């Protein structure tokens, strides 16, 4: 209920503004001030963190957390909007140590830093619609990337955020990337339920925009005829779970990013079997084990320039927060791939 209320609150604000006969110009100016303030906060935090890292020295790339708590483009439940703070809490909860499996220390700011969240709901409360909102997300990512050596690791949010994030990464780096996409679904509908920004359409937007050269989708087990047709249209390499045992060796020795601007990794938590991660909006049995995912990530060769972890839904998690810990572990191991 909370997610539905959050998703519709902005409509009532705009209606009240319209009833009060607020001019379109005045509304636009107000929206611009809110957006500028949001970007300024992220920019100043990124500058401060980057200055610290440069002063410390010895770092080429540091993973930088950026939360995008957006859930209204989900076709089912909007709980992923509440995920970023829960993931952060799980990262630092103290139930495990602060090292990644490869031995990188998360307490070292040269490995991981954080610039906070894009205030999605506050911006939407001002009547900002999705075309402009996606631009705000893209500009937020570019703001992080402007500060060397920060590289964005984005916390969703539903999977619609991957489109503006990948777009920003590609535009900022000056060319396409290769994408490793782990998911139960291909998210490549042209416009799911008429919404071009649906979480089920994000990779259609990415591919038609030319922001990726190769798109590898791993863990797929809920795919329609349109999903397969769209995959063929865009030359997507789709690896379905029904053939995973045959594909395992290849997927655990991937080499990506040569000849392009690097590798982007997008992890939808529902790529995992729900036995490992029940706190997702779209539960789809028959998925990857957590160790399957880690083997793919750990063995991947390529320069990982950015990534995201999406579709964790805290409202469907277990009482003890098992899926939050899973999402946090994914963030930790992606941090190890990005930082250097």
Curated annotation (Swiss-Prot):
Molecular function GO labels: agmatinase activity; arginase activity; metal ion binding
Binding site for Mn(2+) 2: 183, 185, 268, 270
Protein role: Catalyzes the hydrolysis of L-arginine to urea and L-ornithine. The latter can be utilized in the urea cycle or as a precursor for the synthesis of both polyamines and proline.
The protein's name: Arginase 1, mitochondrial
Entry keyword Hydrolase: yes
Catalytic activity: L-arginine + H2O = urea + L-ornithine
Cofactor(s), names only, from the UniProt record: Mn(2+)
Gene Ontology CC terms: mitochondrion
A biological process term (GO) from this entry: urea cycle
Entry keyword set: Arginine metabolism, Hydrolase, Manganese, Metal-binding, Mitochondrion, Transit peptide
Protein family membership: Belongs to the arginase family.
Residues that, per the record, bind Mn(2+) 1: 159, 183, 187, 268
CDD domains linked to this entry: Agmatinase-like_2
KW Nucleus (keyword) present: no
A Pfam short name: Arginase
Pathway the protein contributes to: Nitrogen metabolism; urea cycle; L-ornithine and urea from L-arginine: step 1/1
Binding site for substrate: 185-189, 193-195, 311
Transit peptide region: 1-24
Organism: Oryza sativa subsp. japonica (Rice)
Disulfide bonds: none
Cell location: Mitochondrion
Cofactor note: Binds 2 manganese ions per subunit.
């Amino acid at each position: 209920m909370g997610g539905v209320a959050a998703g519709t609150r902005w409509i009532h604000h705009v209606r009240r503004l319209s009833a009060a006969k607020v001019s379109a110009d005045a509304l636009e100016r107000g929206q611009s001030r809110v957006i500028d303030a949001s970007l300024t906060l992220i920019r100043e935090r990124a500058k401060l963190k980057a200055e610290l890292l440069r002063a410390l020295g010895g770092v080429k790339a540091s993973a930088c957390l950026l939360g995008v708590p957006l859930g209204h483009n989900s076709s089912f439940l909007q709980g992923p909007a509440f995920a970023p703070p829960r993931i952060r809490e799980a990262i630092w909860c103290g139930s495990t140590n602060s090292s990644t499996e490869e031995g990188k220390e998360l307490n070292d700011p040269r490995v991981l830093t954080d610039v906070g969240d894009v205030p999605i709901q506050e911006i939407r409360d001002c009547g900002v619609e999705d075309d402009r909102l996606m631009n705000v997300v893209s500009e937020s990512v570019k703001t992080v990337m402007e500060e060397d050596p920060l590289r964005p690791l984005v916390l969703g949010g539903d999977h619609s955020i991957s489109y503006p994030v990948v777009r920003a990464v590609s535009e900022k780096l000056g060319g396409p990337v290769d994408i490793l996409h782990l998911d139960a679904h291909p998210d490549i509908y042209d416009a799911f339920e008429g919404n071009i920004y649906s979480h089920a359409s994000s990779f259609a937007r990415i591919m038609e925009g030319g922001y990726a050269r190769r798109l590898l989708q791993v863990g797929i087990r809920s795919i329609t005829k349109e999903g397969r047709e769209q995959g063929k249209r865009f030359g997507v390499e789709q690896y379905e779970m029904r053939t995973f045992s045959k594909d395992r060796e290849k997927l655990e020795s991937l080499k990506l990013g040569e000849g392009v601007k690097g590798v982007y990794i997008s992890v939808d938590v529902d790529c995992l079997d729900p036995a490992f991660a029940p706190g997702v909006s779209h539960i789809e049995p028959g998925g990857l084990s957590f160790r399957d995912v880690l083997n793919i990530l750990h063995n991947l060769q390529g320069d990982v320039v950015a990534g995201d972890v999406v579709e964790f839904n805290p409202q469907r998690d277990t009482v003890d927060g098992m899926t939050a810990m899973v999402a946090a572990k994914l963030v930790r191991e992606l941090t190890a791939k990005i930082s250097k």
